[in-house]
Amino acid sequence: MTLDYDENKPLKAFVFKTVADPFVGKISMLKIVQGKLTAGVSAVNATTGETVRIGKLLKLTGKKQEEISEALAGDIAAVTKLEASTNDTLCAPEAVAALAPTEFPQACYFRAVNLAGGGDEGKLSGAIRRLLEEDPTLKYVHNHETHQRMIGGLGDQHLDVAAAKLKSKFGMEVKMSEPKIAYREAIRKPVTIESKYKKQSGGHGQYGHVKIEFESYDGDELMFCEKVFGGAVPKNFFPAVEKGLQEAAEHGSIGGFPVVRLKATLIDGSYHPVDSSEMAFKTAASMAFKDCMKEAQPYLLEPVDSLKILLPDDKQGDVMSVLSKRRGSVLGMNSVGGGMTELLAEAPEAELGDFALTLRQITQGLGEFTSEFARYDMLPPGTEIKS
């Protein structure tokens, strides 16, 4: 695409920065690449395909804001409350084509974030999302399993700046802590458990009786099967048994972590024509699961991440040594030129909390890495649980 900053050509403007102003709201800064941008007109966001209206158009000089009617090719201008994000391209309807976006580094250093004195976490989430609009290198996620809100950036200083902005712009003082790790539990030993739930009171009672084989398998989810013969347990109670097992498997016996790689086969049981109910069989299945976790030698699984590390050639040995101390392993390496190497590795997530800081220190700020979840592996005996 040829760009010559001709103000007579159709509009093309690039959103290169977004500022979250606590009083004005969102301010989008644009470079007019060609054509002219006029207040009050509509343009097409080439990135999203949506038509947006240009509201108040501003010229920024330091902290001074001057309202203007139009901006020409080559100018820098700002628009308030624009429905666009950093890296979006605004175009005239007759010439819609997005400009190449700026590539930002990915967040690699995460911390759990909460309001220091407690309070409305929803307001905190809203304030952080405002920061994300102006800083694409920040990331915000809610881990529903560990019940933590996490903010990610490029390092500790980056997150310190984000915390300072939350306080100065939105009046929110936050505290940050090490994230919890989402462990799993599994069993070593196959067991057969018989469980009976029987409760008698005035009127109808409760009766559910199950015999279940528990064993490990390769899948991540709980697998439920049935091999009941002769109608010992009526088919209409099978879903209740499965539901009882699934709910019980959400909390294991070691640390209350979800139980995975578990196959449960209902092989026998009994029922009462009057007292049996879905609730009774659900309860009996839950009791059987708890007994299983006592006898089947449960153990912990930890998440392992795949890493792509970019580092100077002469720092390979130092980084590999750090990975080894963090129970990591190197899978391979590729030369990418310019005196840099890409290192492919794996390491437990629990060992990567401050890896971004260590990598930056070793490589004098030249190293960077990305990570993604790979699988769950058995936690070595004696290893500290970070939860």
Q: Predicted regions span which residues?
A:
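Structural and coupling elements of P-loop NTPases
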Residues: M1-S387
